[in-house]
């Protein structure tokens, strides 16, 4: 209040110069009037600032509209696809696609000045990140130097590291000493090539680190004996099996493990290890808290580079798996069981090196940030990660995470598994080349993600459940390759496949003569969700066959497919027949008997005119309530008319209807969001712009006139 009074005094001195004036001479009532005028004049400006900066409803609704439109735009999805391919981390690629379209955190479109500011902020952030990265590198080097200085060096225990002398015993002695607490439990391998001619046994509370130029060379060439460099349990020198006790807290970092499996000239055996049946790097059984990172694995012979059985809390991070030698004598049924990383329960059949047969599951296993491809000596890997065995006596491996890896031209699959529970396959990149560009090629085809079922006709078990396949990129050039396959492979098999989610994947199918669907879902028992996938090219988009229970197919987008976009198929005495047939243009899914969720998927026609029309409609998630059984929509014209009717009824509202069976009747629940109508922001906000200046001018003028009149009046009286 005092500040306002002083400002008014200054103003009066301007209008009545050369006189001593004090507003304190005015009556209280007059002062109140002046203050009221001033406050009223500024109220519009203040309220405008408040509403403009903090109108949560308007901002939220406009944000939802813009975000929905962009998320469903085919153009954005194409940009998203391109960005994800260019990025090593596909998850980051998806996130960055939004910033390309200039969307702020609250969903509003930024102005050019805001973009400039963002560029500056980005530069500052990038600088800070680079600084942080350098600091991390320096810190890592310091830690590494301290590790080297305090750890037990294998050369101090007699290792030579020339690739000729057998260094196995020296390495084992160093590990045994570290297990007793010497060197802080740390073992260091300086630069060199360390030949080992027998298995090295890892011990609890030990940490092995290799110089980046250090290599472990497998020289185990014993008939009927595992040729595996490191094991967490005991396996006697005479080949006798023992029951493994538990091990824990083991880490291995850096360097290269050469499994020495490159083939001889005839292509029938391992050139340097002719007596072995297979070669590998790690057998991890009955263990807890095991970490393997920054390791290069080269040239396994037939077998698994890493085998994980009955173990928990296992991490494989930032590693490379290069090359798998396959003899010409191998049959297809043998080949497809050769995963580079195998994850399985602890059984004698699955893990034959030990007598443990309790079926203990593997859990909390993460494979991330790694590359899988071919080497100079051997061809591509068969399957990067997975398993091929499961029985009733075992527990399902659970909480398996496969994140941000690159699977480069796998022969059979990037990920293939059976009997898994709680699986997340996210942010990976899968590339599949044509036969002419491949060393190893399977004529029967491939599925880059293959959740299949083990042949079980006696055991009732859950085959695969709670599986999420999300935000991956698939680049397919081979006509015999599917991107994603989730299946119970035979109706005669016991057990269920359920709770499957396939979402936000981008499939780029460039094969000119493709023979396979991009996504195949076979005999899923319940809770199947296929949503927000973008499929570019190929023959068929999504095929769902002989599946039941709750099925949701939502907001998928298709471009330049030569066949059907979405097919629901069931088998009967006459063979297979479609429950639903789609057609060119917009297609509305109507599931068998109207039991499942009914939504619209945005489809792209083969010409640009249709694509542009679909882009305009892409933010709709329309509902079709069909009482027909086995309804079929074969006319694209009818489909578009139905869409137009629904659009007119809904008036900027989005609704999804989920049908479910209750007894003999059908119950409807509106369980997904009803978006509010977007408010007209211009009508809701106060006047802005030039009106602000006018209000301010009138306010100042009014105050000036009143003060002048009152001041002159009292000036006369004082005289």
UniProtKB/Swiss-Prot annotation:
Prosegment location in residue numbers? 689-719
- Name which cysteines form disulfide bonds: none
Q: Which UniProt keywords apply?
A: Cell wall, Coiled coil, Peptidoglycan-anchor, Repeat, Secreted, Signal, Virulence
Q: How is it used?
A: Has potential use as a vaccine component.
SUPFAM superfamilies attached to this UniProt entry = Pectin lyase-like
Q: How does it sit in the membrane?
A: Peptidoglycan-anchor
Q: Where are the PbH1 repeats?
A: 287-310, 362-384, 397-419, 497-523, 525-546
PROSITE patterns according to UniProt: GRAM_POS_ANCHORING
Query: What InterPro entries has UniProt attached to this entry?
Result: Beta_helix, GH28_Enzymes, LPXTG_anchor, PbH1, Pectin_lyas_fold, Pectin_lyase_fold/virulence, RHGA/B-epi-like_pectate_lyase, YSIRK_signal_dom
Query: Which residues does UniProt call coiled coil?
Result: 601-658
**Recorded GO CC terms:** extracellular region
Residues with PTM Pentaglycyl murein peptidoglycan amidated threonine:
688
Report biased composition (Polar residues) as residue ranges. 623-634
Q: Which residues form the signal peptide?
A: 1-45
Basic and acidic residues bias: start-end ranges: 606-617, 635-655
Put simply, this protein is called Plasmin and fibronectin-binding protein A
């Amino acid at each position: 209040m005092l500040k306002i009074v002083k400002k008014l005094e200054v103003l009066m001195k301007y209008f009545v110069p050369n006189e001593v004036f004090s507003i304190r001479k005015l009556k209280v009532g007059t002062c109140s009037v002046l203050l009221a005028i001033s406050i009223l004049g500024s109220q519009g400006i203040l309220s405008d600032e408040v509403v403009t900066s903090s109108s949560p409803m308007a901002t939220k609704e406009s944000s939802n509209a813009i975000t929905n439109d962009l998320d469903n735009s085919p153009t954005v999805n194409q940009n998203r696809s391109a960005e994800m391919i260019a990025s090593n981390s596909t998850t980051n690629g998806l996130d960055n696609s939004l910033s390309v379209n200039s969307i702020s955190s609250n969903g509003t479109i930024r102005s050019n000045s805001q973009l400039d500011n963002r560029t500056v902020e980005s530069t500052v952030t990038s600088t800070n990140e680079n600084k942080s990265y350098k600091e991390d590198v320096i810190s890592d080097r310091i830690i590494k130097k301290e590790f080297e200085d305090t750890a037990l060096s294998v050369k101090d225990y007699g290792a030579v590291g020339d690739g000729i002398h057998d260094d196995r015993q020296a390495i084992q002695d160093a590990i045994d000493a570290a297990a007793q607490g010497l060197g802080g439990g740390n073992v260091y391998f300086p630069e060199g090539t360390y030949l080992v001619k027998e298995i090295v046994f890892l011990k609890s509370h030990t940490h092995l680190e290799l110089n980046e130029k250090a290599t472990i060379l497998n020289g185990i060439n014993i008939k009927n004996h595992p040729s595996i460099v490191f094991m967490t349990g005991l396996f006697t020198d005479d080949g006798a099996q023992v029951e493994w006790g538990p091990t824990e807290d083991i880490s291995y970092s850096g360097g290269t493990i050469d499994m020495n499996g490159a083939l001889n000239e005839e292509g029938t055996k391992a050139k340097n290890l002719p007596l072995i049946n297979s070669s590998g790097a790690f057998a991890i059984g009955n263990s807890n808290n095991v970490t393997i990172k920054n390791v290069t694995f080269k040239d396994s012979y037939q077998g698994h580079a890493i085998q994980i059985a009955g173990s928990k809390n296992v991490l494989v991070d930032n590693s490379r798996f290069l090359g798998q030698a396959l003899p010409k004598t191998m049959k297809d049924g043998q080949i497809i069981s050769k995963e580079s990383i195998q994850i399985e329960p602890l059984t004698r059949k699955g893990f034959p090196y030990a007598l443990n047969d309790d079926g203990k599951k593997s859990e909390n296993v993460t494979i991330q940030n790694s590359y899988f491809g071919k080497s100079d000596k051997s061809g591509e890997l068969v399957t990067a990660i997975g398993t091929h065995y499961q029985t009733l006596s075992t527990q399902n491996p659970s909480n398996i995470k496969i994140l941000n890896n690159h699977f480069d031209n796998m022969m059979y699959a990037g990920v293939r598994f059976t009997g898994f529970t709680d699986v997340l396959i996210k942010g990976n990149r899968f590339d599949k080349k044509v036969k002419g560009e491949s060393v190893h090629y399977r004529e029967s085809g491939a599925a880059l993600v293959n959740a299949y079922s083990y042949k079980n006709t006696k055991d009732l078990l859950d085959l695969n459940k709670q599986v999420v396949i999300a935000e991956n990129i698939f680049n397919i050039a081979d006509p015999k390759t599917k991107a994603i396959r989730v299946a119970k492979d035979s109706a005669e098999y016991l057990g269920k496949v359920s709770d499957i989610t396939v979402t936000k994947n981008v499939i780029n199918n460039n094969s000119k003569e493709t023979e396979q669907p991009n996504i195949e879902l076979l005999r899923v028992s319940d809770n199947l969700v296929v949503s927000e996938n973008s499929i570019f090219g190929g023959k068929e988009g999504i095929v769902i066959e002989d599946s039941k229970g709750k099925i949701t197919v939502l907001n998928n987008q298709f471009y330049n497919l030569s066949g059907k976009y979405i097919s629901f198929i069931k088998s009967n005495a006459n063979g297979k027949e479609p429950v639903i047939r789609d057609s060119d243009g917009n297609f509305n899914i109507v599931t068998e008997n109207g039991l499942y969720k009914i939504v619209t998927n945005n489809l792209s026609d083969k010409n640009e005119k249709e694509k542009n029309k679909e882009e305009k409609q892409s933010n709709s998630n329309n509902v079709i309530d069909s009482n027909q059984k086995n309804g079929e929509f074969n006319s694209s014209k009818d489909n578009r008319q139905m869409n137009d009717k629904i659009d007119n009824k809904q008036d900027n509202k989005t609704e999804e209807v989920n049908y479910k069976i209750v007894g003999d009747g059908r119950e409807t629940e509106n369980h997904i969001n009803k978006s509010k109508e977007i408010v007209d922001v211009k009508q809701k906000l106060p006047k802005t712009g030039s009106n602000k200046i006018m209000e301010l001018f009138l306010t100042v003028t009014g105050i000036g006139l009143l003060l002048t009149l009152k001041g002159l009046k009292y000036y006369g009286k004082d005289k």
